[in-house]
Amino acid sequence: MTETVAIIVAGGRGQRAGAERPKQWQMLLGKRVIDWSIAAFVDHPQISQVVIVAGDELGDCSAEPKIIQAKPGNTRTQSVLSGLAAATISEDATVVIHDAARPGIDAATISSLIARLQDPSVSGAAPAMPVADALKTNSGQSWTNVDRTGLVRVQTPQAFRLGEIRAALSAAGPDLVDDLTAIEAAGGRVEIVSGSARLTKITYPEDFDMLARLLSPTGAPRIGKGYDVHEFEAGDHVTLCGVAIPHIAKLKGHSDADAAWHALTDAILGAVALGDIGDHFPPSDPQWKGADSGLFLKEAQRLAEAKGYVIANCDITVICEAPKVKPHREAMRARTAELLGLPLDAVSVKATTTEGLGFTGRREGIAAEAVALLMPKG
């Protein structure tokens, strides 16, 4: 069978989606929009390479041998050509080009497109859906109905042969609608396969909600809440979210007494009804003496994933008069996100006081609360 490479184009600005960050880097059901497409192509048995055309926002993908990164161009066509140049395949190999802003790609659509390119008379294939809404055009003076007969909404991914699509795009003008148009302009025969609402391109803010409903796996999200308290004892720092914060005392506990991570561990365990931190790491067990609370947090994550749930986001609140948490807040967020493998914007850390009331007001210790949202694995 002919070798097939996927090219994911992720260089767009996505300004109409209504956020400061381009849509492909925003979160959808617990992971970045682009990660949905990456997973679909990496996991497909007929895809030998996945070329991702993106800037530094992509991050390190070196652990996945299928992935190659290419730099984006100034236009979409230039970005696609950059991806084609990075692919290490023959001229007659199949390429499947996909917009990163369409997270609903599925294995069946990929397979259908690849199958169409096995016919040597077919130069391009794409999914499309019939136009369901009434259409009108404005002549400048009045609105006129447009006949919908034969009209479709073309989506991605779109499949071609490497040599043909490279030549077609190189010859295309600046007003190219999509890659399929370039093949048609070059005289190639194209075929349409059945599209899906799941393949809708994220363009406007409301598209996120619509696709979240379509892509949500079976099962409801889970929410857990955790709370922890530790008193002060003689020492020179406290540990919160794995970050050592200088102080005139330390927190007393069997482990490292990281109240913030203990609360988050309980929140994760509670979300999947697996008891609390004391059930899994009892203070009576000497093996946990002085232990790094990151071990507890990672084990809670592992147990949740074993039950079919992944962490979508978490929110931690530290309650104390001292030390001042705000100067260390970003480091605490970063350390938690790194440990759990979450995007930074999926982790919130806040701090507050009790206005001098209670044991925290008397500076006798620190309390922490955490809330975690877990989603069924997609």
UniProtKB/Swiss-Prot annotation:
Site-annotated residues for Positions MEP for the nucleophilic attack: 148, 201
CDD domains referenced in this protein's UniProt entry, alphabetically: CDP-ME_synthetase (cd02516), MECDP_synthase (cd00554)
Reactions accelerated catalytically: 2-C-methyl-D-erythritol 4-phosphate + CTP + H(+) = 4-CDP-2-C-methyl-D-erythritol + diphosphate; 4-CDP-2-C-methyl-D-erythritol 2-phosphate = 2-C-methyl-D-erythritol 2,4-cyclic diphosphate + CMP
UniProt keyword annotations, A-Z: Isoprene biosynthesis, Lyase, Metal-binding, Multifunctional enzyme, Nucleotidyltransferase, Transferase
GO molecular function: 2-C-methyl-D-erythritol 2,4-cyclodiphosphate synthase activity; 2-C-methyl-D-erythritol 4-phosphate cytidylyltransferase activity; metal ion binding
Residues the record lists as binding a divalent metal cation: 228, 230, 262
Name the UniProt record assigns to this protein: Bifunctional enzyme IspD/IspF
UniProt source species: Hyphomonas neptunium (strain ATCC 15444)
